[in-house]
């Protein structure tokens, strides 16, 4: 059996989310998973880049998250890589998120999957979409910070 991961280790990150959205509020949600999905997560076979969170009947669901089944997965279960996964949050948090998502321009995006006390958690964020010029501005700011850091580093030598 594989070694259990560190309690706070990350499984997968959604780097595209920070580029495409203004992240406003973050939440940590539990996930309802099948056994083969947990094994795939332990092996690090997860991808969040196309994932998004959908609200249906007062519950949160993670869609578009790819979990590739291991070759040693059970023969009597047919694993589906893009299966919809239910997210677990407190009722008050879900109500608050429903109210904000119904406002124009807000959506829920998954940021990362990580282990916490032997359980898989999904960090989600309430986000607003960035326009193209906002993306360009954030790239310019990031490059400006890099240049300043380079200048300070070379000056200190």
Curated annotation (Swiss-Prot):
Location(s) in or outside the cell: Cytoplasm
Single GO MF descriptor: RNA binding
Residue pairs linked by disulfide bridges in the UniProt entry: none
UniProt xrefs under PROSITE patterns: SSRP (PS01317)
GO biological process assignments: trans-translation
Principal localisation: cytoplasm
Segments of this protein annotated with the region Disordered: 133-157
Top-level division of the source organism's lineage: Bacteria
GO CC terms: cytosol
Keywords: Cytoplasm, RNA-binding
InterPro entries: SmpB, SsrA-bd_prot, SsrA-bd_prot_CS
Function: Required for rescue of stalled ribosomes mediated by trans-translation. Binds to transfer-messenger RNA (tmRNA), required for stable association of tmRNA with ribosomes. tmRNA and SmpB together mimic tRNA shape, replacing the anticodon stem-loop with SmpB. tmRNA is encoded by the ssrA gene; the 2 termini fold to resemble tRNA(Ala) and it encodes a 'tag peptide', a short internal open reading frame. During trans-translation Ala-aminoacylated tmRNA acts like a tRNA, entering the A-site of stalled ribosomes, displacing the stalled mRNA.
Similarity comment: family membership: Belongs to the SmpB family.
Annotated protein name in UniProt: SsrA-binding protein
């Amino acid at each position: 059996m594989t070694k259990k991961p560190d309690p706070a280790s990350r499984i997968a990150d959604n780097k595209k989310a920070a580029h495409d959205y203004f992240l406003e509020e973050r939440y940590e949600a539990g996930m309802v998973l099948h056994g083969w999905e947990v094994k795939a997560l332990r092996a690090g076979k997860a991808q969040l880049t196309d994932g998004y969170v959908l609200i249906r009947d007062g519950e949160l669901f993670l869609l578009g998250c790819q979990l590739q089944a291991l070759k040693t997965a059970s023969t009597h279960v047919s694993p589906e890589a893009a299966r919809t996964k239910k997210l677990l949050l407190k009722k008050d948090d879900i109500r608050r998120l429903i109210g904000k998502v119904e406002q124009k321009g807000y959506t829920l995006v998954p940021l990362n999957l990580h282990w916490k006390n032997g359980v898989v958690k999904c960090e989600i964020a309430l986000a607003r979409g960035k326009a193209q010029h906002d993306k360009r501005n954030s790239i310019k700011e990031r490059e400006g910070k890099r240049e300043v850091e380079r200048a300070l580093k070379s000056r200190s030598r």
